[in-house]
């Protein structure tokens, strides 16, 4: 009887831990999507004050490109620096990002606005990579990864729509976004406490088990490595193609927004949230 009770308690604890990880995953990624898209919207509007629509699109291309560089830079930081050092750098990046965001509201020229945007989005790329890294490790092996990612994207879009529709003032929107940077950063720090303390801990255990079962021969490992490389290569190609398509469409929509033909912060933005949910279900 006691064993049955303990078993049920253990199952309940695991379910609660699983639900907690799922909430952290959605909260962290949803918060990042909200911050990134919201700041991009503000940057476009601020840049439109000092240049024409073509200049805004060109500047947007620069900041999005540099955010990708920041995304890649995070991998180098994790590879060459200690975990605690990376943790401190991420905290500093969040604080500096808030300062740069508020700096966009100064009386700036096109070149200074672009410089602030480049610095800001490089740091956002680093923070975004950290958010994705933590979430991926948090849900390693989960079969619901796609659904949770879709839900996180939809929540991020909904938050941006609500922030823009309710506040009606860019300063207020910026303050809300600044608060969200600290909030999702705090959630990321909390989520890291749920991760294994040492990298490769689970991998090492899996390798030992495979060695004992006789399935981890040299040939098996080579085949697994080849299969992994093919999967990674295919994933990179797909992501690159989708990013290229999305960025081209984004440029076209931004051109219409800056020229006054439409406000992309209003209800059409909700289509993105719906597409994210649908992609997660598929």
Spell out what each predicted region is:
Residues 57-78, 274-279:
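Central cavity-lining transmembrane alpha-helices of secondary-active solute carriers
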């Amino acid at each position: 009887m006691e064993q049955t009770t303990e078993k049920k308690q253990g199952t309940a604890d695991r379910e609660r831990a699983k639900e907690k990880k799922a909430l952290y995953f959605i909260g962290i990624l949803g918060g990042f999507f909200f911050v990134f898209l919201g700041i991009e919207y503000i940057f476009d509007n601020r840049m439109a004050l000092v240049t024409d629509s073509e200049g805004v699109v060109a500047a947007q291309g620069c900041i999005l490109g540099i955010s990708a560089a920041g995304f890649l830079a995070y991998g180098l930081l994790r590879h060459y620096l200690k975990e605690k050092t990376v943790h401190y750098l991420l905290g500093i990046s969040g604080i500096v990002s808030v300062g740069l965001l508020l700096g966009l509201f100064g009386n700036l020229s096109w070149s200074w606005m672009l410089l602030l945007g480049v610095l800001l989005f490089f740091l956002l790329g680093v923070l975004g990579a950290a958010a994705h890294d933590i979430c991926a490790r948090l849900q390693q092996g989960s079969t619901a990864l796609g659904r949770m990612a879709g839900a996180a994207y939809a929540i991020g879009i909904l938050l941006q729509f609500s922030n823009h529709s309710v506040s009606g003032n860019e300063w207020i929107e910026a303050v809300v976004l600044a608060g969200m940077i600290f909030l999702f950063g705090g959630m990321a720090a909390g989520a890291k406490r749920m991760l294994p303390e040492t990298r490769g801990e689970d991998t090492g255990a899996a390798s030992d088990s495979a060695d004992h079962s006789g399935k981890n021969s040299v040939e098996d490992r080579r085949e697994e490595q080849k299969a992994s490389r093919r999967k990674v290569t295919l994933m990179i190609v797909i992501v690159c193609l989708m990013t290229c398509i999305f960025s081209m469409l984004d440029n076209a929509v931004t051109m219409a927004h800056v020229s006054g033909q439409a406000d992309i912060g209003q209800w059409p933005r909700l289509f993105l949230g719906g597409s994210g949910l649908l992609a997660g279900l598929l």
